[in-house]
Amino acid sequence: MDKISIQQLAETTRDLILNLILRINSIVEEIENTNGQEVFSNDRLNFILDDFFDLAEAIDIIQQQNSSISLEELTEKLNMLYDSMKAKDKFFFKDIAEFELKPLLEHWAKTIQFTGKH
């Protein structure tokens, strides 16, 4: 992939990451302000998981240009999130989303903006 394409992919991926962070905040808030069990029965989780798969595809390409981004980290955290969903454990889900996944995405949002610009 050429430099311009990598840069465009990085910009699009950063936008997706920022969107995912907002959606994680919304889900965490829903869990905190309600009994939170319905979080596992609505389509929002399916949509956000689809977007995480898209993110994983982009990260797989970007990590070749930016060594501070690793698909392995995302996979590990998504596996933990999936385990919490299978167990319908809203507190584990909230903790993984808020304290594991969100900080990783915030770090990537800062780091990824420089990918392809050198």
Question: Across the structure, where does each feature detected by a protein language model lie?
Answer:
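C-terminal-biased regions
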Residues: 1-118
